[in-house]
C-alpha cells in the first residue's frame, strides 16, 4: 500500500512549512478528521509520526433500487456498514409517482441515518436495466425527463450522486470489498 504521510512528507507535498503543516494537522486532529497513527520505523534518524483520515471523517451512502425492494446503506472510510435498511414494500414502476417515492425514500433515509449530511461525501445509486454512468441516465426507467435520473436525485438530496447498473455496482462492491482484489481476473455471475 501507499506510505502513510508524516509531517515532513505533507509539508513537502503541499509546499507548506513544517510548522504550518503541524498546526493544520493538529487542528484536523482536534476536529476528529485526522488520526495520529503513531511512530513508524525508518532506516535512520528520528521516527516520524504518521497520520490518516479518521473513519468518522467521511461517509458514503448507497441505494439499490430493485424491482421489488430498495436497500439503503451508510459506510465509513473502511467500508464498515454503519446503517443498512431494506424496504420490501417498494415496487419499481416507470411512473413519475415512483420517481418521487425513490427521491423521498432516499431523503428520509439520509435524514434518519444519524450521520451529519455534510459528512456524506457521495451517494451511489444502482438500478436495474441499462444505465450510462457518465450521463447519469437510465435507459429503462424515468426516461421522459430532460434531466438525467442522477441529476434529479442529486438535486433532491443535495449530495453528489453516481448512478450505475445494479449488476455492475454489485460486481464492483464484491471486487472492492472482498479478497477478489488480490485476483487479476474475476468473473461475477
Which residue stretches match the model-derived regions?
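Gly/Thr-rich phosphate-binding beta-strand-loop-beta motif of the actin/hexokinase/Hsp70
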Residues: 47-84, 187-189
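Short coil turns linking two alpha-helices in DNA-binding domains
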Residues: 17-24
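A short alpha-helical element within helix-turn-helix/winged-helix DNA-binding domains
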Residues: 4-5, 9-14, 28
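Conserved phosphate-binding catalytic cores of ATP/NTP-utilizing and phosphoryl-transfer enzymes
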Residues: 36-58, 163-186
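Glycine-rich phosphate-binding loop and adjoining helix at the ATP-binding site
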Residues: 84-185
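Conserved hydrophobic residue
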Residues: 3-4, 34
